[in-house]
Amino acid sequence: MYILVGSVTTATRLKKAAEKIIGFPAYVVHTPSALNQGRCSYSVRVDDRALNEIRKIAGDNEIPIRRIYIERTVNGERVYDVVS
């Protein structure tokens, strides 16, 4: 799952909070070019199972999320579905 945020600083804050609270590893990564619409080029990558926890963590820590995508593979190509 990719969580798009406004800046690398915000991505780092979300990553640290997520790892501390849910225990899943989270990574600050470059946003895939298919998702980057001229905005921040960094997002947080975390396990899809953490969706509800990520939303709660972001809300509790006043971290604005621009969009959340789930990645899947269709016919050998990556496809991104908008979650929110």
Regions found by a protein language model. Name each.
Residues D48-S84:
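C-terminal structural segments of small proteins and small subunits
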Residues K15-K16, R39, R55-I57:
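Short, glycine/acidic-enriched capping/hinge loops at junctions between secondary-structure elements
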Residues L4-G6, Y27-V28:
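Short, conserved beta-strand edge motifs with alternating hydrophobic and charged residues
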Residues V8-P25:
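Short amphipathic alpha-helix segments
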Residues S7-A11, V46-L51:
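Helix N-cap motif at beta-to-alpha junctions
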